[in-house]
Amino acid sequence: MRSKFKDEHPFEKRKAEAERIRQKYNDRIPVICEKVEKSDIATIDKKKYLVPSDLTVGQFVYVIRKRIKLSPEKAIFIFVDEVLPPTAALMSSIYEEHKDEDGFLYISYSGENTFGEALEEAN
């Protein structure tokens, strides 16, 4: 998925910002969270997050759900490099494995499992 944040900000500026953030807040992870383009889920009000390194993926999903005011019965999927990360994984380990060369971790979210195999509905 192409990041709008990357399109709007040149690489050197993004890299410098991520480095500044990591120096100032070494226990935090700079995350860019964007909606998957064709998803019908609500658009998030802010893209940039400073996430505690000991936060789990599940806790981060909870933060996103709150920001987009998603009702409990609605599904949300988050993707890192077009893969669903494990809910119990720490954001710090996801960051170390998947951070971009600019120093940010890019996460996309959707109301559908757009990159994995299709989920079948039970009748």
From Swiss-Prot:
Proregion span(s): 117-123
One BP term from GO: autophagy
Site location (Cleavage): G116, E117
Keywords tagged on the record: Autophagy, Cytoplasmic vesicle, Lipoprotein, Membrane, Protein transport, Transport, Ubl conjugation pathway, Vacuole
Principal place of residence: membrane
CDD domains, per database record: Ubl_ATG8 (cd16128)
Lipid-binding residues (covalent, Phosphatidylethanolamine amidated glycine): G116
Pfam families for the chain: ATG8 (PF02991)
Membrane-topology descriptor: Lipid-anchor
GO cellular component: autophagosome membrane; cytoplasmic vesicle
PTM field: The C-terminal 7 residues are removed by atg4 to expose Gly-116 at the C-terminus. The c-terminal Gly is then amidated with phosphatidylethanolamine by an activating system similar to that for ubiquitin.
Domain of life from the UniProt record: Eukaryota
Location in or out of the cell: Cytoplasmic vesicle, Autophagosome membrane; Vacuole membrane
Family of this protein: Belongs to the ATG8 family.
Function of the protein: Ubiquitin-like modifier involved in autophagosome formation. With atg4, mediates the delivery of the autophagosomes to the vacuole via the microtubule cytoskeleton. Required for selective autophagic degradation of the nucleus (nucleophagy) as well as for mitophagy which contributes to regulate mitochondrial quantity and quality by eliminating the mitochondria to a basal level to fulfill cellular energy requirements and preventing excess ROS production. Participates also in membrane fusion events that take place in the early secretory pathway.
Protein name: Autophagy-related protein 8
Species name: Botryotinia fuckeliana (strain B05.10) (Noble rot fungus)
Classification lineage: Eukaryota, Fungi, Dikarya, Ascomycota, Pezizomycotina
